Amino acid sequence: MDDAAARGAVAAAWREYGDRRAVRRAEETSAHVSTNRVYRLHLDDGSTVMAKASNYGSYFLFAEDHDRLSEVSSLLAGTRWSGFLAGILPRDGRPFRWYDGTCWVVLYVDVPRGESLPRTLSLPDVECLGREVASFHLACAEASSRLPAPSHSMRSDMVALLSSVGDADRALPGLGRDDGEVVRRSAHELLVHLDRCDVDHWPKIPILVDWNLGNFSVVRGDGAGFRLLTRWDYDWFRIDSRMLDFYFLSRVSSATGDRTAFTYSPHTLFEERFLAFLRSYHEVAPLTRDEVLFLPWAYRFFVLNYVVRDGRRFFRSDLADRFRQEAVSTYLPGAGALDASPLVAALGLD
């Protein structure tokens, strides 16, 4: 979506929202990695509101996700996590959304931004992050029993992908026929594994998936460590196994650090620093053996769903082409060799 179209959509959304305050200036804050556009609206009373314009994916799943997000925020009120998730501006008792049939806009509270973690975390910070995310996951697990069931899952997403490359004569847009065979085989193997491990009966909690350092802030106390303060950006929010959060958490924990030029390599899942993260997480919210063994499959799901299936619609075109080509040439062919059993042993779960 280009800037002019996004600004027009945001202006129309603000008019429909019906707030009497006027927008004096719309300051773009987009990361320019995805096709979404994000703006900070400066209002005539000196306050600010965040607006996101998008045409990525399905509006109806977007609407469902934001209903769930709003419910999660309400359920976390009164807990340590009250105010952590940037709120969605409501109208008539529901999260407000503007939709014109082709694109959509949502308005968010401009939450206070605390300190950003450094691009490469110290080992104590990695361990602290493990404890903090574990605490957040526990709160989300408690809230999850009061949320409606989601309409999509890992299984349904992979069935949709497999249907799009269902025969040898059909290729994904932007990928060749041989690439389609790599995707088809990898998605089929994942679906077989989901069935074997009975993932439908695993606990499902609200998860955010994309834990890059630009999406959350922290506050440091007088002693060592920090507390997660605020979180924004919900592009990949879903209700699913907590294990889908861990690939990005391995990236944040990595010695590679948060980089402006990046790939979606699985190597971060097997660094000692991620094991330190897992140990700290496990002390607060114990993991099961099956969950840890699922980590390579969670990584495979990320690549298949967010890079291959949705990548052309979500990422900037030059990034989408590179990420998808890396996926089919390197990451998916090598995914079968990924083995989480050393992590299981290190956590004492063998």
Predicted feature residues:
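Conserved NTP-binding catalytic cores of kinases and kinase-like/nucleotidyltransferase enzymes
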Residues: 1-91, 220, 349-350
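An alpha-helical support segment within catalytic cores of ATP-dependent transferases
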Residues: 8-19, 145, 166-209, 219-223
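ATP-binding pocket architecture of kinase catalytic cores
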Residues: 47-147
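A cross-family kinase active-site recognition segment
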Residues: 119-178, 204
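Active-site activation/catalytic loop segments of kinase-like enzymes and analogous catalytic loops
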Residues: 243-285, 301-318
